[in-house]
Amino acid sequence: MKPRPGVFVDRKLKQRVIQYLSSNRCGKYVDTGILASDLQRLYSVDYGRRKRNAFRIQVEKVFSIISSEKELKNLKELEDGHLAKRARQDEEDEYTESYSDDDSNMEDYPDPQSANPMNSSLLSLYRRGNSESVSTTPKWGQREATTSTPLLTSKTGSVPLKTPARESEGGWFIDKTPGGKKESLPLDLSDDQSNSKKQDSEIQILKDSSLLESDKKRKGRAKGKGNKRKTENLQEVDGEIEALLQKKAKARSTELQISNVKFEDVGGNDATLKEVCKMLIHMRHPEVYQHLGVVPPRGVLLHGPPGCGKTLLAHAIAGELDLPILKVAAPEIVSGVSGESEQKLRELFDQAVSNAPCIVFIDEIDAITPKREVASKDMERRIVAQLLTCMDDLNNVAATARVLVIGATNRPDSLDPALRRAGRFDREVCLGIPDEAARERILQTLCRKLRLPETFNFCHLAHLTPGFVGADLMALCREAAMCAVNRVLMKQQAQQKKKPEIEGLPSEGDQEERLGAEPTSETQDELQRLLGLLRDQDPLSEEQMQGLCIELNDFIVALAEVQPSAKREGFVTVPNVTWADIGALEDIRDELIMAILAPVRNPDQFRTLGLGTPAGILLAGPPGCGKTLLAKAVANESGLNFISVKGPELLNMYVGESERAVRQVFQRAKNSAPCVIFFDEVDALCPRRSDRETGASVRVVNQLLTEMDGLETRQQVFILAATNRPDIIDPAILRPGRLDKTLFVGLPPPADRVAILKTITKNGTKPPLDEDVNLETIANDLRCNCYTGADLTALVREASLCALRQEITAQKNGVGAGELKVSHKHFEDAFKKVKPSISIKDQVMYEALQRSLSQ
């Protein structure tokens, strides 16, 4: 039976159904529902998303087609076997049949090619019984013919007439002798005749059985070979299916890992390790909690910026407790098939309970636990609900099932609030940006296996790396090692150039010819040198390797190549700005030291006096007077982390995003305390509020006020702000407890201008000044009365450009080049081009503003 022309048959599905049936998974009877569900499970990529009923109907159609084809194939084999048997019987027939018998046989057996297979099969079975009676009639007919021959002769007496024609129907013989006298022939059925008849039939049956047995043996041998090949093919198919299922099961299950990391490998987090040790007591002594009847904590949430050591701490916990760890990345749990993500979570927690005591570590857990009220898909909500259920089920398990769940994320605020309640991730450990002391301990931990000089200064290197986390310091060590190798190879190459040419080795000229043309620039020279190092396969000798070590200069060179990840998060590294780079402003410097540096350097005295919350400082004054430079110098001198926030960059067009940005800034500072937050152009963030205004700026001001002095205390978080217009800032932000101290950074007086000029020119050495230049005279010039520090910097730069322009013109005219210096004439030319950035009108306004702030 073939499918109708209008019925579509999926050939791939048909082949897979045949493969499934041949694997003997279904037994003797086939249930199409089970067959369809198994196919959807095995081939989830192709059929996983199809509806069950529709797919089951399609499988039923394919199964009916396969069944009909199998029946037709079996019927064809039966017919071919019967025809082959009849052909062999005709060849081995030892009896001669009469003309009538031949005619009857020709009539009885139709052409198998033209007959219907079913009809021909039935007719062959029907003729089988008839052929036995026909084959036994010749003796009886011969005997009858011999007795009747004299009676049926012609009157002429020589030629005999034809024997009477007989027809057989169903074993009965009918005499159809034409015309004349009919003789009634006696039907003699005596014992002799019956015995002879039985003997003839038995002989014929034995012949047929012997032929059938030989035919069966031949077919059995051929069929045995075919069955053997078929069995081998089925075994191969079963092996492939089993391997595929095992591979899928292995990919779905999470392997247990044994961690070799200890707490001693985690440097610079002593306070964090102390807190973690208190939380892990129940993993060592569960009998205490069981005796007290208290459910031990099950979840720990590690959060902090990227690279701060969350994954390392999780492995250190597993290694310190000597427990296996089930590590899984959160995106691996998410699946495209509905319900499979939840199943993976259930299997993960079931595996953890069966392997208890153990630790489950879910990295980047925020990928599967967003806030359900803002989740865009139902699948995300179901995953969160499933994780909550699994966490609650751990509390219902007996206390002997010691399972600790650790989650790590960079964005704890994006997690669903239900996940952070008691009984789930009730313990949160914050890993912030390490301070200078923590960086020193991290460097000592990372450099334990490195070859360093004995007098290596870790403190100085830690001072040069503000904003670096553990991953950045590891990258710094790797880059410093590369710099050390490069330095040694360069030294070796320089020594080889000085040595005479060794016999058998190519000279430097040959190497340059092999490398290409001679370098025409410094970049090409460096490239050729590096190519020479790559192609040089001579290993370093033990003498050269003996003195090889990573020096402090290698780390300093590597600092230019490594960009800390915290810098992308808003942290600014300012290692080069010190008090020496700021001329004058002595009184403001003392105020900043007392407000920011004193609480860090003298915490005990501040606690004794009851000085808790650090005061915020507002730097006000005209632009270009050094407000930002002061903030950088404070952060550098104190060794604190530094977050620079530009006012306009926090504003966002979407409702709630600006407030969230302000909240994230303070949260980052708390995680990295002690830390300095510097708000540049704070007037853009905190404009004066009015009764009619209810826009985004009002919400930002309210959020900023709450973060500065709200219910949550900000310990070791110092606030610096700078503005050119303190008069337009909201008055609420200037009250005590927030930005309660305002320092006015005004235009420098003549004495301060002298100090600023000396700082800019490095006491007349850079740029080199001529003997006729007097910095005090320039600073006391009336044209400098409205100059700010930025204007004085522009004046020195313009004077240097005038000197360079004069030197270039002299070289064009062929005049001998002399020593390049900046003279008084160049400063006079610069005065003509550089104008003060603060006009007299603005100066009057700032003086009035200064008087109002001092009252």
From Swiss-Prot:
Interaction with WDR74: annotated segments: 266-473
Keyword ATP-binding appears in the UniProt entry: yes
Swiss-Prot/TrEMBL keywords: Acetylation, ATP-binding, Isopeptide bond, Nucleotide-binding, Nucleus, Phosphoprotein, Repeat, Ribosome biogenesis, Ubl conjugation
CDD domains: RecA-like_NVL_r1-like, RecA-like_NVL_r2-like
Residue stretches spanning the membrane: none
InterPro entries registered for this protein in UniProt: AAA+_ATPase (IPR003593), AAA_ATPase_domain (IPR050168), AAA_lid_3 (IPR041569), ATPase_AAA_core (IPR003959), ATPase_AAA_CS (IPR003960), NLV2_N_sf (IPR038100), NVL2_nucleolin-bd (IPR031996), P-loop_NTPase (IPR027417)
Region spans: Disordered: 83-234, 496-523
Residues with PTM N6-acetyllysine: K70, K155
Gene behind this protein: Nvl
Pfam families: AAA, AAA_lid_3, Nucleolin_bd
Motif interval(s): Nuclear localization signal: 85-88, 217-231
GO terms (BP aspect): positive regulation of protein binding; positive regulation of telomere maintenance; regulation of protein localization to nucleolus; ribosomal large subunit biogenesis; ribosome biogenesis; rRNA processing; telomerase holoenzyme complex assembly
Gene3D superfamilies documented for this protein: 1.10.10.2010, 1.10.8.60, P-loop containing nucleotide triphosphate hydrolases
Organism field: Mus musculus
Sites of Phosphoserine modification: S133, S190, S210, S214
Family: Belongs to the AAA ATPase family.
PROSITE patterns per UniProt: AAA
Protein name: Nuclear valosin-containing protein-like
Main location: nucleus
Motif Nucleolar localization signal: positions: 49-52
Molecular functions per Gene Ontology: ATP binding; ATP hydrolysis activity; preribosome binding
GO terms under cellular component: nuclear exosome (RNase complex); nucleolus; nucleoplasm; nucleus; telomerase holoenzyme complex
Numbered residues of crosslink Glycyl lysine isopeptide (Lys-Gly) (interchain with G-Cter in SUMO2): K207
